């Protein structure tokens, strides 16, 4: 299988850089996969699990939004936050969800709508993590 250059960058670090076979990205308009030779595109990323496949191995990364750019040079993802599932503190993640739920009562209108949407994204990630842990 043909490979391509993939760089995953967050404000804290270069989370990944190397040749990959495929990257599956949680897009705002739907999840999508990128292979070598993919058409150029820029897409907004929603919070979710990004999956990197290289040499038959998969690595899952939690991303909390950002941008993906596919060009003739490869794929670059600029993520607001990027944390490897292996490094994720699942208890802390669950506590964050609990805190988000508690704070909903103090919000109204569009602020409440945004908070609910963000909470839904976190719960979706938690569900994906739990499903991944069972495999």
UniProtKB/Swiss-Prot annotation:
It holds the Pfam family ATP-synt_DE_N. One of its GO terms (cellular component) is proton-transporting ATP synthase complex. Disulfide bonds: none annotated. It is found in: Cell inner membrane. The keyword Ribonucleoprotein does not apply. CDD domains: F1-ATPase_delta. One of its GO terms (molecular function) is ATP binding. It is a peripheral membrane protein. It comes from the Bacteria. Gene3D superfamilies: F0F1 ATP synthase delta/epsilon subunit, N-terminal (2.60.15.10). SUPFAM superfamilies: Epsilon subunit of F1F0-ATP synthase N-terminal domain (SSF51344). Keywords: ATP synthesis, Cell inner membrane, Cell membrane, CF(1), Hydrogen ion transport, Ion transport, Membrane, Transport. NCBIfam families: ATP_synt_epsi, PRK00571.2-4, PRK13448.1. F-type ATPases have 2 components, CF(1) - the catalytic core - and CF(0) - the membrane proton channel. CF(1) has five subunits: alpha(3), beta(3), gamma(1), delta(1), epsilon(1). CF(0) has three main subunits: a, b and c. Belongs to the ATPase epsilon chain family. Produces ATP from ADP in the presence of a proton gradient across the membrane. This is ATP synthase epsilon chain. It comes from Rhodopseudomonas palustris (strain BisB18). The gene is atpC.
